[in-house]
């Protein structure tokens, strides 16, 4: 078995990756022990503001092994073939309520896998917010859904917040209407959600 060189992290050609934390800030993990890559998962998420004022959030997931393995459904699966390949899109309004949802299983390990796509529109009407993972699991998880598509809805929710609030702030900056009250309101919504938004954080 050989290690696929494409599994190596894609680091920019520079001695130290850029960081705002100063020259002494550590930007790489500790040296790895001798090892061999065996599995690679890639997740790509993107947020879009639409011409009609809604937002599309899209996600793509792929899994690859570094070695050949047998599949009763697919025959021999080689490293260049995805074990899993799923794409999805949700459309939300400014209140983070899902207006449209679709998913496609491009590649899966079993013939029945695409059947899970049929339950994805159960997400329509749900609001991204507290309890999101629980609501997703109830709507599309379990025996009628797909584990990997369900997992994707975690980062999708994060991108929805990043796209929606980032775009609203950008529009206000461009129009000169962004106020300190807006900034404080945004911060209060995220209070104590992480170290940066902790009540005792020194960051403004």
Q: Which residues does each PLM region occupy?
A:
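Short, Gly/Pro- and small/polar-rich lid/capping loops
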Residues: 8-69
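Active-site- and interface-proximal helix/loop "cap" or "latch" segments in soluble metabolic
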Residues: 47-49, 61-204
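Globin-like tetrapyrrole-binding proteins
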Residues: 1-13, 186-188, 198-202
């Amino acid at each position: 078995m050989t290690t696929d060189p494409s599994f190596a992290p894609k680091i920019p050609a520079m001695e130290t990756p850029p960081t705002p934390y100063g020259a002494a800030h550590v930007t790489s993990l500790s040296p790895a022990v001798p090892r061999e890559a065996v599995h690679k998962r890639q997740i790509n998420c993107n947020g879009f503001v639409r011409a009609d004022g809604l937002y599309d959030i899209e996600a793509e997931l792929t899994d690859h092994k570094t070695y050949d393995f047998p599949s009763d459904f697919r025959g021999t699966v080689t490293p260049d073939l995805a074990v899993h390949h799923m794409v999805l899109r949700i459309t939300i309004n400014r209140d983070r309520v899902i207006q449209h949802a679709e998913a496609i299983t491009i590649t899966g390990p079993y013939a029945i896998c695409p059947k899970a796509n049929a339950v994805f529109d159960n997400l329509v009407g749900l609001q991204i917010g507290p309890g999101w993972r629980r609501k997703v699991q109830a709507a599309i998880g379990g025996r009628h859904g797909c584990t990997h598509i369900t997992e994707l809805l975690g980062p999708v929710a994060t991108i929805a917040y990043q796209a929606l609030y980032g775009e609203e702030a950008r529009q206000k900056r461009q129009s000169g209407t962004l106020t300190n009250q807006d900034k404080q309101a945004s911060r209060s919504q995220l209070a104590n959600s992480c170290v940066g938004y902790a009540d005792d954080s020194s960051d403004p």
